[in-house]
Amino acid sequence: GLVPHIETVHDRLTVEIRRGCTRGCRFCQPGMLTRPARDVEPEAVIEAVEEGMLRTGYSDFSLLSLSCSDYLSLPAVGVELRNRLAEHNVSLTLPSQRVDRFDTSIAHILGGTRRAGLTFAPEAGTQRLRDIVNKGLTDEELLRGIRTAMENGYNRVKLYFMIGLPGETDADVLGIVDTCRGLQQQCRDLGRLQLNLTISNFTPKPHTPFQWHSVSTTEFRRRQQLLRDALRPLRGIKTNYTDVRLSAVEDFVGRGDRRLAPVIEAAWRAGAGLDAWFESADRSHAAWTGAIEDAGLGGSYRALEMGGWSAAEAFATGDLEDFCRQPLPWDHIDSGVDKAWLAEDLGRALAAAVVPDCSFEGCSSCGVCGPELGHNVVIPPPPVPPPLPPRAPASERVCRLRFAFAKTGSLALISHLDTLRLLERALRRSGLPVSFTGGFHPLPRLQVALPLPLGVEGLHEWLDLDFAAPVDPETARERLQAELSPELLLLSVQAVPLATPGLAQQIRSAQWRFSLRPVPDQPAPEPAAPDHSAVTPERWAAALAALLEATSLPWQDKDKKGRPRERECRPYLLDLRLVPPDRGLVADRVLDLEAAVDSAGRSLRPDHLRHWLSEVLGQPLVLGAVQRRCLRLDAC
C-alpha cells in the first residue's frame, strides 16, 4: 500500500479482521448496515499484518472491526503476531473495545515495546438506559474489565458516554457520574484510576431503531451543564463535550433528503470544513446555518433544533406505531434490515427489552440473512500459541555510518519530524540491522545534523546511523536508497568511529543561497525613511557591506514560553555576498550566506537577513527560493 510522507490521523498499518456487527446497539448505523457479521480467517490476518509491516515500515499496526473483541480468534492472532514480529519493535493497537470481553489474554497482546491507551464505550450510566440502547453490558462486567486493565498496568482509561438517548432522565445522566465515582472507589486498591470521558450528544441515524428520535439543543445544553456541575468535585476525571451546534447540524444533515445537496456545497464554499475542530466551530456553524437558510430549509432545521421528533413521547401516548409509519427520505433505500423490524425494535427499546447478539445466540429476524446477503460467519478460535519471552530490540552499537544526502523538490515541504519518520520507515523496509535506543520507547539510533526549515531544500545534509551488526557502507547506501524517494538522495557514505562526537557538536557553519525581491509601493520599516527608487546593484553592495561591518545585529523573538527576548546575532554572520544574476532575474537578487552554527544549533536564517536588509535599504523585501547548500563539519 501507499505510505504517506507526512503524519496522518491513523498513522499505522490497519488490517480488517471482522466485517459487520450484530451486537444490535440501537443508535449504531454501521452495525445495522454491515450485517451479517463475517470473520476473516486467522491465518489471512496474520499473513496480511506480517507482510504489511515489512513492506510499509510502520512501527504500529491496528486490527480493525466494529467490535474487535467479538473476533474470537483475537487472542490467538495477537500472540502469534507478537511472536513473529518480536524482533521488529512494533506495537498493536485496537479501537474501542467491548469491556465485557476485555480479559487478561487481550491485555497481554496489546502494546508491545510501547503501550497505547485503552478505550471502552459503556454509552450510558445506568443499567436501564444501557438496556434501552441494547448495549448488553452490566455494571459488574464494566468493573471487571476496568480492574483487569489496571491489573495489567493501565491506570488511565478513556470512556465514551452518550446523552440524549430515548427514555433518558436526569437520573440516567447523573448515573454517568455515579458510574465513574464507583469505578474509582472500587479500584482504589489497585492504584489511582484516571478517567478521560467523552460525552457525545445523541444524533439519530437513518436505518436504525433510534432514527425516529431527537432532542432539542436547549435540552442538550441543560444536560451538559447538569453533568458539569456533578463532575466538578471529582478528581482524576477529564471530560470532553461535543459542541451542541455541531450536533444540530449533524442531525439535520444525517436525516435530510436530496434537497441537501446544494446546502452541502454552499456550506463548503462558505468556509465549512474540519467542523469538529474547536478553532473551526464558529466559522463552520455560521457557514452551515447560512446555507440552510439560503436554501429555504431554515424552518425544518429549527424544528429539529427544538427536538422535532420524539419517539419517547409517541410511546408514552400509545401512538408509536402510527408515529413510525411516517414516510422517511431514505425509505427507498434497502439496507437489508426491514423498516418494520426497526420500528418493533424501537418499541422493545422503550420497554428496556434486550435483543441478543445473533452471531452467538438465536436469530433476531431483522431480515438481513438469506441468499442475497448470506449469513453470519463466525470462525471457531484456534488454540492460543505459547507466547515467546519478550525480546528487546537490538541496542548494541557495532558500527556507525555517516551519510551525506539531499532533500529537494516536494520533500522540502515536509517537516523535520516527518523526515525522521520517513527515514525510520525506510530503514525498517530495508532490513538493515539498525540499532535501537533502550528504555520504554525504543527508537532507531539516527541523527540528522540540523533540522531544515519547512519549504527549504537541502543540497548537502548529514545523517548518522548506528547499526547492531557490521554493515558494508556502500551496500547500506544502496539498500536504503532503494526504499527512499529520488527527492531524498543519498549522496555518499562513510564509516566513522562510534566514539565520534554527535553531528550537532561537529557543525561549524551553514551555507545558504536565497533570493530577495523588493516590494514597491509599500511602507518601509522603521527607522529608515521610505525610498521607492530602484534598488541598484551599488545599493545592494553597500547594504551587504553595512551588515558585514556592523558590530551588532540584534534579533527580537520569543522563547519557548512565549516571553519576548533579544539575541545578538552578529557572531553568526561569517560571509554575505551577491551572486551574479541569471538572465530573466531582473528584480530578484540572489545572495550567498555563510552562517556559524553553535553546539545548541543556534544560527542565522535567510529571513533574518531579509529583515536587516529591508531596514538598511529602506525597502520592503520578499524572500524567494531558499536552499541550504551545505553544512560544514569539523572534519570537512
Give the positions of each predicted feature.
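N-terminal pre-triad scaffold of radical SAM enzymes
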Residues: L2-R26, M53, L94, A116, ...
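Canonical Radical SAM [4Fe-4S] cluster-binding loop centered on the CxxxCxxC motif
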Residues: E7-E43, S365-V378
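Conserved SAM/AdoMet-binding glycine-rich loop
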Residues: E50-N196, S200
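Flexible glycine/acidic-rich beta-alpha junction loops that bind and position SAM and/or redox cofactors
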Residues: L72-S73, F102-I106, R128-V133, I163-A171, ...
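Short, charge-patterned binding micro-sites
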Residues: P204-P206, V434-F467
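Radical SAM enzyme core and accessory elements
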Residues: L234-A392
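Core RNA-modification/binding signature centered on pseudouridine synthases
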Residues: S395-V398, L413-I414, T419-R421, E526-C636
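Ordered, amphipathic secondary-structure segments that act as subunit-interaction surfaces
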Residues: E461-R513
